């Protein structure tokens, strides 16, 4: 890598390059060639030729000098892949210039294989992932696993026995039980299948971005056995016909279980109430309007009262439309330095305070999705202390990244609501640890490549991440922010309880939705890629943990 201290002995000229990213890291040359530069889009108007020491201290403290060092996991991984809060390994090669997302590459990192997705060059000849679908539930024994069940509090090494799609016994096998298949799970952790409350399947309407088959297939690779899909489809999920279509195609795909979230208003326009009872009968487990605000607060209040009458769950994505309009990043030092329009913290807290008051008035069971600020988490904690029936979730990347990730105008970090400050990230982590936020979701939003090949403000927001949900979440354990049982609870029983789903537990007679993973192994993100959306900033990173098996209703939907 040009400019790195170890290169200067061989190439004295490399040491003369101006290092502004901290020791050993130089700012890459910017290219303006009359087109978008992918996730390295051209800055709006401001020049960056001079960085003061104060700016470096305030804006760039997260860039680490140990870039491209071995990941240092206890298992002895020497993959030299960066951690998820470091720059991507594939972003700087050869000459040191930044490669645009989607640029053709002569070698390995983004090579597409005939099965779809991206693999390293040395993996082209073989697929490391074996997907078996369409099988009937197997008669299976899982032997010697560390079984963690947050609902019962179990955390011990024991056996699991599965028959006819159900978990028949934990510990000793039932009398006369003869498995047709056994898994030696010594050293593995067996946990309830993960439950993800926010996975955009992109179908119907946006098949260029993803499909129900591709995204549920990616979900089981991340250990997800049950997921909720939001109503932002085309047509909008505001009729029973659309809900039935999604469920039929999910059953045909045969991977994760899908629980649709219906639209609270017709067309998500915030004017007329959708047919909530018909949607519930068609299989919708909750209702929401996404980031689309109601035009009239009285209409929203009536919708909540109606939902409370039938004990329906309403999902809020609290963001004030006027305060957030036109914003691209958190309104702070990074946005000011980059010249990006900001979205203040109050865009969340103002709307959240209003929504909590309406929940208190109506008595509806409410779930607040995609919290981004520490003050927002504090408002949820106060509401729970008052006895309000409210729960909350946070996108996993909000617990890992901050707005400092935008410093190179990478559109891979363009998300809505935006990444916020370190203080917000730390506050959210503390809320997850204490249980105020009881669910962690991927907020999976797959995009085609063209969606990110534009200047930053013209790109579509979102990160494709459901395939990495468990390995990414394991970074919180590696960093000492959560212990493993707490993490499993926030990924399984917590989200299941929030939306009252029949999932997230290991008990005799329960559906055999199980994830088996190796906490001591590592995953290099992108070695295999099953989602249609490759808009993931973590590709090329070394992540702790590796999913070995995912069982859905007793079927092995994924094995590695």
Language-model segment annotations:
Residues 455, 511-560:
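C-terminal cap of metal-dependent C-N hydrolases
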Residues 76-132:
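Adenosine-phosphate binding glycine-rich loop
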Residues 138-193:
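Histidine-rich, glycine-flanked metal-binding segment
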Residues 1-41:
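Glycine-rich phosphate/diphosphate-binding loop of Rossmann-like nucleotide-binding domains
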Residues 42-64, 205-207, 293, 297, ...:
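Glycine/threonine-rich flexible loop motifs
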Residues 337-365, 412, 433-440, 445-520:
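His/Asp/Glu-enriched, well-ordered alpha-helical/loop segment
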Residues 185-253:
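Metal-associated gating/positioning segment near the N- to mid-region
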């Amino acid at each position: 890598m040009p400019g790195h201290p170890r290169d200067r002995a061989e190439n004295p000229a490399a040491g003369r390059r101006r290092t502004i990213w901290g020791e050993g890291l130089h700012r890459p040359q910017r290219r303006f060639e009359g087109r978008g530069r992918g996730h390295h889009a051209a800055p709006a108007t401001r020049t960056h030729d001079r960085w003061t020491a104060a700016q470096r201290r305030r804006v760039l403290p997260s860039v680490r000098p140990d870039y491209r060092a071995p990941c240092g996991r206890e298992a002895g991984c020497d993959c030299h892949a960066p951690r998820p809060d470091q720059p991507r390994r594939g972003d700087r090669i050869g000459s040191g210039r930044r490669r645009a997302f989607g640029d053709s590459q002569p070698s390995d990192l983004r090579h597409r294989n005939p099965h779809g997705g991206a693999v390293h060059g040395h993996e082209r000849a073989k697929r490391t992932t074996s997907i078996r679908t369409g099988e009937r539930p197997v008669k299976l024994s899982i032997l010697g696993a560390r079984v963690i069940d947050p609902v019962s509090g179990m955390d011990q090494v024991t056996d699991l026995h599965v028959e006819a799609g159900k978990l028949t016994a934990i510990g000793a096998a039932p009398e006369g039980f003869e498995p047709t298949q056994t898994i030696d799970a010594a050293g593995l952790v067996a946990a309830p299948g993960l439950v993800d409350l926010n996975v955009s399947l992109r179908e119907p309407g946006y098949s260029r971005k993803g499909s129900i088959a591709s995204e549920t297939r990616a979900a089981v690779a991340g250990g997800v056995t049950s997921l909720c899909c939001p109503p932002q489809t085309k047509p909008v999920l505001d009729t029973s016909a659309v809900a039935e279509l999604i469920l039929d195609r999910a059953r045909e795909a045969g991977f994760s279980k899908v629980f649709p979230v219906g639209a609270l208003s017709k067309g998500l326009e915030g004017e007329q109430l959708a047919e909530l009872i018909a949607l519930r009968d068609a299989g919708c487990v909750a209702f929401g309007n996404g980031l689309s605000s109601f035009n009239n607060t009285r209409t929203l209040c009536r919708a909540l009262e109606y939902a409370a009458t039938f004990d329906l769950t309403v999902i809020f994505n609290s963001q004030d439309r006027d305060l957030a309009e036109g914003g691209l990043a958190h309104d702070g030092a990074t946005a000011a330095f980059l010249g990006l329009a900001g979205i203040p913290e109050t865009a969340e807290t103002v709307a959240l305070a209003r929504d909590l008051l309406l929940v208190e008035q109506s008595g509806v069971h409410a779930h607040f999705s995609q919290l981004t600020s520490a003050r927002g988490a504090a408002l949820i904690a106060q509401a729970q202390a008052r006895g309000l029936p409210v729960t909350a979730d946070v996108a996993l990347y909000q617990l890992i990244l901050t707005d400092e990730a935008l410093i190179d105008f990478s559109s891979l970090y363009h998300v809505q609501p935006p990444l916020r400050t370190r203080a917000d990230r730390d506050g959210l982590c503390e809320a997850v640890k204490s249980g105020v936020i009881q669910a962690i979701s991927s907020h999976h939003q797959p995009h085609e490549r063209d969606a990110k090949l534009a200047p930053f403000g013209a790109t579509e927001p979102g990160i494709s991440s459901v395939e990495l949900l468990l390995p990414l979440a394991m970074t919180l354990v590696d960093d000492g922010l959560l212990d493993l049982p707490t993490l499993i609870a926030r990924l399984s029983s917590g989200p299941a309880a929030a939306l009252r789903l029949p999932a997230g537990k290991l008990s005799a007679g329960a559906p055999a939705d199980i994830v088996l993973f190796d906490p001591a192994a590592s995953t290099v993100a992108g070695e295999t890629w099953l989602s249609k959306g490759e808009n993931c900033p973590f590709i090329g990173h070394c992540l702790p943990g590796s999913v070995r098996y995912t069982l859905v209703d007793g079927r092995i939907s994924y094995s590695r």
